[in-house]
Amino acid sequence: AAAPKPATAAPAAATAAKPAAATQATGSKAAAINFALSKVGQAYVYGGSSDGGWDCSGLTQAAYRQAGVSLPRVAADQADTTTRVSLDSLQPGDLLFWSNNGSNSGVYHVALYVGDGKYVEAANPRAGVRVETIADYAPDFAGRI
């Protein structure tokens, strides 16, 4: 009788660990993540907010717009609309911010956390929209919608 319990428990645990990061997010956050991931490979254009080219805050604004959430256009203003969370407690859908002074007023870049230590960003003209890892280019702080 003891053998079936571990056999039953193991597949359940394996199944629970399999979903992709976007499916772990719920509701609008999953929609925002899926939208942003669908833009990977597209061009970066300063001030861009469409399939013709994205900049960092244009991408995050559009992703959340598709999810029914209104965000300001500028990265620093987006930081103002979030509640700060620890980088150790990130959840898919959180916004990641890079700042030259550690505060919202110094924010110069924003990306969307997708889970598993990864985020999607409109990086720069050379890289375009891509998935990057926190280990390779860590943000200064994060905010939750």
Question: Would you name each region that the model predicts?
Answer:
Residues 1-31:
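N-terminal low-complexity, Pro/Thr-rich disordered segments
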Residues 21-145:
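Peptidoglycan cell-wall recognition and remodeling modules
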